[in-house]
Amino acid sequence: MNNASGTSLEFHKITTLKEAEDFVYASYLRAATHQDYAAKDAGKRHPELTRSLLRQKSITSCVVVTGSKGKGSVANMISRILQTNLSVGLMTSPHITDFRERFRVNDTMISEADFCRLMTQIRPEILDIASDLPESVCISPMGIQADLALTYFTEKHSDFNVFECGKGAKYDDVNNIRHDYAVI
C-alpha cells in the first residue's frame, strides 16, 4: 500500500512526530484524490472500518462531546471537573501548536516518545484494515487518532475518558467508542 506521494506504508518504526502525523493522514490523502469533495458524508466517510477495533479497546467509562461549536471547550471543562477525583484521558482536535496536544491525561500531553512508540504499535492494525480498501475509501484521521488515544489512555490507566467528536457524529469514528454519556 502506498500513500499519496507513493511512499510505502508497510511497517517500520515511527521515530519522529512528522512521521507519526503523516501516518494519521496517509490513508485519507491517498483516497482524497479519488473522491468527490461535494459528495455527501455517507458516500465518502466510513466509520464502520474502525468500529470493531475501537469498540474492542473501549474498556473505560467515556463521554463523547459533539455539536457544531464549542466541543473542545466543553470536553476540556468536563475533563477538568472529573480530574478532581479521577485520572482522565482527553482527546480533542484540532491542536494549537503541537499535534500531541490532542492526547492528554490529566492535562499532560502525550510525550514525543510515547506518541511515536504507540503510533508504531497501532500501525499494523490500521494497515491491516486498509490493506484491501478501494482507492476512494480511507480510514479517517479521527479513527486513527481515536485508536491511539484509547491505547494511550489504557496504558496510563485512566479512570474516565473524554472524546471530542470530529466532523459530524453520525459519520465520525469517535462515535464507535463505547461511551456511557454523550453531550451535544
Which residues are covered by each model-predicted region?
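Short active-site-proximal "capping" loops at secondary-structure junctions
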Residues: K69-K71, H95-I96
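Short functional linear segments
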Residues: M1-G67, V74-N76, R80-T84, M91, ...
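Conserved beta-strand/loop subsegment of P-loop NTPase cores
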Residues: Y181-I184
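ATP-dependent carboxylate-amine ligase catalytic core
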Residues: A38, R55-S58, L86-R178
